[in-house]
Amino acid sequence: MSDGNERNQDGNNTPSQGGEQTRSSRLSLRPAGRQEVGRTVDAGSVRQSFSHGRSKVVQVEVRKPKRNAAGPGAGAAARGGRAGGRALTAAELAARQRALELQRKAAAEEAARREEEKIQIMSAAEAARRAAEEERLISEQKAAEIAALKESEQQAAREQAAAEAAARAAEQAAAEAAAREAEEAARSAPLDPRSHSTGGVQLAAPVQRLRPLAERAIMPPRPVQPSRPAAAAPARNNETLHLRSGAAAGGDDERRPAPRRSGPGAPPAPPRRPSAPSRKGGGSDRRSGRIDVRAAIEGDDDKTRSLASVRRQRDRERRQAELERLRSDQVRVVRDVIVPETITVAELANRMAARQGEVIKALMKMGVMATAAQSIDGDTAELVVEEFGHRIKRVSESDVEIGIEGVEDNADDLKPRAPVVTVMGHVDHGKTSLLDALRTTDVAASEAGGITQHIGAYQITAPSGKKITFIDTPGHEAFTSMRARGASVTDIVVLVVAADDGVMPQTIEAIKHAKAANAPIIVAINKIDKPGANPNRVRQELLNHEIVVEEMGGDTQDVEVSALKRIGLDKLEECILLQSEMLDLKANPDRVAEGVVIESRLDRGRGPVAALLVQKGTLRRGDIVVAGAEWGRVRAVLDDRGRQVKEAGPSMPVEVLGLTGVPGAGEPFVVVENDARAREISEFRQRKIKEKEAASQVAARGTLDQMLARIQAGVQKEVALLIKADVQGSAEAISTTVQKLAHEEVAVRVLNASVGQITESDIQLAKASDAIIVAFNVRATTQARELAQREGVDIRYYSIIYQVADDVEQLVKGKVAPKHREKFLGYAEVRQVFNITKTGKVAGCYVTEGLVKRGCGVRLLRDNVVIHEGELSQLKRFKDDVKEVARGYECGLSFAGYNDLREGDMVECYEMEVIPA
């Protein structure tokens, strides 16, 4: 066989009687456990051939289908048992049932396989149908494109035919003009017509067309003969210039278009096909069978190209020319290149449409070595742009803030607004109590220690119906920045002075802030109900600070009030409203909101909360606000009593929720048009803040390094603090206060001052820096508290600011090294020197002044010059050790490690005492 398998002869000669016996016998159990239902088996062997001459003999079986026995007896015999009539045993019955079960399973598997093949065939048919449908759609699309292309070519052919008709009309007009000129020439100089014969000279087609006109103009009229035109036609045909082999059969068709021939005898003109315009003028005449001398001389016999091909060629040439023009050094495209303060070399090359290598080469010529990823400053980039011949446009990063404040308001749009009044004065002079009396609230009771430590804004309605906005500022000396912020946003300053206390340091500071803000002052002399109150003393003390009240001939209003007894409150409101009318306060409510951040904090449940004072426009819920370096969409607007409002007009203090972070107190806020603008401005301001911090760190690095070196050397110590407060203003005030407590030997370093709860990251920072956490009106989270206990970090909670200052001062004093001072004890004169074997030299001395103590410091003076300074090792009187020897007594002295003693030397005794810091 060709496949390498050979049938053994023994397998071919297998007797068939075994098969007949199998067909006649019934189902039986084989020893191997394999069941066969009446099939004959032909056994044999096959030799398989492999590569490299190898072969192998394997045994094979050929199964043949069983032949069904005819008649009912066969089935009965199969059901009833063997031929002998013996009943089936249980094992045979079980084997038969298993065989039947296997057959059913095989049939079910075969049916499932056929069903799966059917599904696969149907899926393949569906895929083929879809592919055919897609091919049909593609072919239809291509046919539509071909039809559109043919239509465009036909349109071009029609346009070409129209152009040819126009050219023929122009040619005919030129011929008529030439005929008129020839007629005029003939009239002026008549000649013999026979002398004008061509004489065998072949003329061009335009000349032949003009010849009949010239002959009629020159020769006299003759009687018309019927046979002359037919005879003249061959003559004219013989005189025509033939340049192509098929031109003789054309006759006048070469000179005149075919449609002019008409009549029953004229042969039908062949249908004209639209021809594409040729690259030269004679292409269409060559197609129609006519030609002029110019085309014949040029000899343009090339095949005509299609319009699409010509258009593509022209586009390629135009693009190539433009590319060559751009690449050439002589022609450059001048661009407007926008250059910021800093730009990378790659970005600069991209904006100039130049190669990065060329830009780097230009920088190298300028002495600047830079890679494509490095940044260069704007001045260097400007030189590069000018070197490349472009126009530069310098921009700054701060340009993102251009136009953020809007335009100036029109005077017609301004409307009266409520005055903003800031209450200032010394601590415990009753500022908050006065505001509580005006608002009929009790804010002072909620403040820790009875002093104001937050800046608050409130709005009240006077009995006249007009509104007044009050800003309460702290009076403690630590809150200087808060008072400055309050004075900067105010219209009127109410200076509260206690009648029993007079002008105090913070009162003077408040006067300076008010004058710096150029705000009018109204003096409120409070606590007039207390015994010992003297308002006139207050007025006189104010004269020392250039505050002259009206009672003393000045222009500053003063009101005597009592917040506790509610005396003079209505008069104070009248003075405020009168002053606001004099100032003529107005604002435009119909514009985007602008204002200032009064205070800010981080609330655990609500997130960043900012107290805003609207100065212009109207702030609404949903506006996008940029406050300092933070931005966000306003989610809620709350008034001073915690009620939600939809909008806030000018001079209205509100709290807003929805900012991404805690803005700085005193920062301006403004409403912008979209999120992208707000995010851009916020990122720019945050970047500026980081750059400023980095610059300050670099500037202070030398001092800081020196301080750390002194700390490591033990010369200087430090107190590291991490401040966490409830509001931004308190954090600033505490940071400023503790830094003023630094000692020349102990430095106070504030690692961070922020708002919000104490978190695990704060504990880790304090642990790494060995710092103490100062918590002002905030608490630590559960996880942070557990971590602090494990790490041993000290967290100190405060609610009053002067307690913070006192504790930090004690910490600083505890780290200050105690000072030592020398205390003089007395003098002793050396009168005799004894040499003791074990002890060395011992000086016998007489105490001339003071006393001598054992273990004190001594100086040995010889001729009033100190020759030794050390300690006294032994002090004896006779042979007994004593603690001290007074004046007028003799004693024996020995010095530790020194024996150069002489008679007449003086011993000065002293001791060091510790002075607490």
Curated annotation (Swiss-Prot):
Lineage: Bacteria, Pseudomonadati, Pseudomonadota, Alphaproteobacteria, Acetobacterales
Principal cellular location given in the protein's record: cytoplasm
Region named G4: 526-529
PANTHER family xrefs: TR-TYPE G DOMAIN-CONTAINING PROTEIN, TRANSLATION INITIATION FACTOR IF-2-RELATED
Residues covered by the tr-type G domain: 416-586
Gene: infB
Region (G1) residue spans: 425-432
Protein name: Translation initiation factor IF-2
Tagged with keyword Protein biosynthesis: yes
